[in-house]
């Protein structure tokens, strides 16, 4: 019963923020969301979970305090609480910094890898997907008030590079996915400078891919690369799905992740942001290295093990229709990209 109440609080907090036009109610939704998710992060109770929940609380509380401070400053200078009406440059800058901290974007990304490493995969799934929606909604609305889009461009490039370099030599899957999240969010923030609609489309597709990889890891009960190398012994189908989704996260054709990078690159080049596109692609090449390394180790290598584990491949496997649909969207959405572009009327 308590878990259901907390899940309802997370849902209501996010919805309140996403559909609010006032900074006060947006802040209130963020607070409801934060107070609901922290007790869930403590289960199962352990020293690592307690440490991660404390880090998450401090970072989110600082960000929320900055948001209410900046929105109050904007109210005193302009008399407006409306999110879409931001006239004070100091207030806009403070709110952008606060949203960067909430999203875990560079240069304020320090908390995200440590928090994800300390929680279980189920909470990692929520933090990496659902918890991104409310701050991203606010950031898209605030970005329309920016006179200088180079702020978003700088944040985007720093996040992609930080995610790429941070993911190198990681052996823990949750930390690796945290740096992957930082890198992909950098791409989404970058396209905000030229197209809000495209940023929404790429956000939804990325969250679907991220949802898929976390559900596969939960199914395989893998938190380290060595665990993933033995996943073939549990279920070969989930093992294959994991490899395909990793390649999609890396942005290789013909998978869905390639559509994200192709559409964003095309939109940026159409707006003469060629240097930014080159930097984003360079950062993605770094990320692609550890995706390919992980796929190679998962598909072709075998961690040191004993003979008993090689007989577990007949373990019962129960398929879930929703998870399978998410998996298909994660790897096979590229042929539908022309339809999606026309549907959302994206300006390339």
Curated annotation (Swiss-Prot):
The keyword Electron transport applies. InterPro entries: Complex_I_Subunit_2, NADH_DH_su2_C, NADH_UbQ_OxRdtase_chain2, ND/Mrp_TM. It holds the Pfam family NADH_dehy_S2_C. Its EC number is 7.1.1.2. Disulfide bonds: none annotated. Signal peptide: none annotated. One of its GO terms (molecular function) is NADH dehydrogenase (ubiquinone) activity. GO terms for biological process: mitochondrial electron transport, NADH to ubiquinone. It is an enzyme of class 7 (translocase). Keywords: Electron transport, Membrane, Mitochondrion, Mitochondrion inner membrane, NAD, Respiratory chain, Translocase, Transmembrane, Transmembrane helix, Transport, Ubiquinone. Belongs to the complex I subunit 2 family. PANTHER family: NADH-UBIQUINONE OXIDOREDUCTASE CHAIN 2 (PTHR46552:SF1). This is NADH-ubiquinone oxidoreductase chain 2. It comes from Myxine glutinosa (Atlantic hagfish).
